[in-house]
């Protein structure tokens, strides 16, 4: 994606999330899981419940869905993410994406990651103490999560502006599927050349057929069913 892209979002693709959430709370008409490989618009999950704004009032990010609830991922020391164990058996941290109402086993390797997710999205206070996880005053060896969680990727292993930085994305933060670029506006070009005509009504495909230039996961501002991409990719 490029700065100035105006991207249409199908808000009914995974069930229509009702807005404003300050009136209804979280409600969704119809529910459909997000498939792997689709480009998705979602609200910024980095602050979780610590952000006093309602979820639908937060910044809008886009990324492609790399992993779904129940998947296991291997993350090496360089931040590369794999859906299968690397063949060279390099040291990796293994994390499982939580499913709604399913228990996840906690280990010294993964509890820091889950501790952050519990504090942000599960409405509980958690802390790692002496290689053990303490949740709401009790030491636990597993935890039952109340949301489905997704891994959103920037499509570039060197750019960590994705779930490697802000963590798993809960289902409550999902807005919809990116369907096409309505138009693209280059604000740095002369006035007569600002419209990137070749990008007008460009269809957004799955990750294996459509990748952003430079791979940066852009953020934007939600207006109706469109996202205005504001970040410039290298």
Give the ranges of each region predicted by the language model.
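Extended hydrophobic leader/signal-anchor segments used for secretion and membrane insertion
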Residues: 1-234
């Amino acid at each position: 994606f490029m700065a100035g892209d105006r991207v249409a979002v199908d808000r009914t693709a995974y069930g229509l999330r009702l807005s404003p959430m300050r009136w209804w709370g979280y409600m969704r008409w119809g529910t459909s899981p997000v498939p792997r490989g689709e480009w998705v618009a979602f609200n910024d999950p980095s602050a979780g419940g610590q952000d006093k704004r309602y979820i639908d009032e937060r910044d809008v990010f886009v990324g492609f869905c790399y992993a779904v609830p129940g998947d296991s991922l291997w993350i090496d020391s360089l931040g590369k993410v794999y859906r299968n164990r690397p063949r060279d058996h390099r040291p990796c941290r293994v994390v499982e994406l939580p499913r709604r109402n399913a228990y996840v086993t906690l280990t010294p390797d993964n509890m820091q990651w889950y501790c952050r997710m519990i504090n942000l999205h599960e409405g509980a206070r958690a802390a790692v103490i002496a290689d053990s996880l303490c949740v709401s005053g009790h030491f636990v060896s597993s935890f039952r999560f109340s949301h489905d969680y997704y891994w959103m990727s920037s499509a570039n292993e060197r750019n960590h502006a994705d779930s490697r930085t802000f963590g798993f994305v809960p289902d409550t933060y999902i807005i919809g599927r990116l369907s096409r670029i309505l138009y693209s506006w280059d604000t740095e070009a002369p006035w007569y050349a600002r419209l990137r005509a070749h990008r007008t009504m460009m269809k957004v495909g799955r990750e294996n057929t459509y990748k952003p230039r430079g791979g940066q996961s852009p953020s934007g501002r939600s207006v109706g069913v469109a996202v205005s991409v504001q970040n410039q990719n290298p």
